């Protein structure tokens, strides 16, 4: 899991 995907919610 990457932080970029996590912040694109």
UniProtKB/Swiss-Prot annotation:
A GO CC term assigned to this protein in UniProt: extracellular region
Report the locations given in the UniProt record.
Answer: Secreted
What superkingdom does the record give?
A: Eukaryota
Q: Name one GO biological process term.
A: neuropeptide signaling pathway
Main subcellular location of this protein, as a coarse class: secreted
Alphabetized, the UniProt keywords read: Neuropeptide, Secreted
What is the similarity comment for this entry? Belongs to the FARP (FMRF amide related peptide) family.
Q: What does this protein do?
A: FMRFamides and FMRFamide-like peptides are neuropeptides.
Q: What is this protein called?
A: Extended FMRFamide-2
- UniProt source species: Praedatophasma maraisi (Gladiator)
